[in-house]
């Protein structure tokens, strides 16, 4: 009879994986664990990632709803600076023909230069006189 898998701390392999009986287990200790179960779990993970991104999309950094939400936030915030253009994402699952063009936006102020929004992976492009 096989022993059930327990969560074992292995100093060399700190990866925990869920296996038989739903308990955490280290990948290295296969004597007690079911290898097949591990493979199944990994395959499921990979499949889930493929479905999320779609076959031909670039590797997506954010989900579609997240980017839409962020875009709204940025657009709302942009009115404070007097920017009238909304922003478009250059990378991600919902880009349309604007690959590598950067994001066009008006110059706010010569001193301010480019607004840095670190929360999203966006590239800005200066536009207007004075650059």
From Swiss-Prot:
Which UniProt keywords are present, listed alphabetically? Meiosis, Mitochondrion, Nucleus
Say which domain of life the source belongs to.
Answer: Eukaryota
GO aspect biological process, one term? meiotic cell cycle
Its predominant location is mitochondrion
Q: Which cellular components does GO assign to this protein?
A: mitochondrion; nucleus
Q: Describe the function of this protein.
A: Has a role in meiosis.
State what protein this is by name: Meiotically up-regulated gene 115 protein
- Annotated source species: Schizosaccharomyces pombe (strain 972 / ATCC 24843)
């Amino acid at each position: 009879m096989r022993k059930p898998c327990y969560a074992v701390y292995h100093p060399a392999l700190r990866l925990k994986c869920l296996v038989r009986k739903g308990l955490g287990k280290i990948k290295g200790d296969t004597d007690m664990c079911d290898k097949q179960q591990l493979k199944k779990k990994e395959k499921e993970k990979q499949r889930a990632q493929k479905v999320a991104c779609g076959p031909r999309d670039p590797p997506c950094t954010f989900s579609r709803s997240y980017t839409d939400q962020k875009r709204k936030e940025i657009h709302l915030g942009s009115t404070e600076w007097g920017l009238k253009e909304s922003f478009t994402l250059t990378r991600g699952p919902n880009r349309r023909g604007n690959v590598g063009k950067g994001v066009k936006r008006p110059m706010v102020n010569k001193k301010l230069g480019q607004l840095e929004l670190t929360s999203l992976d966006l590239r800005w492009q200066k536009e207007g006189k004075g650059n």
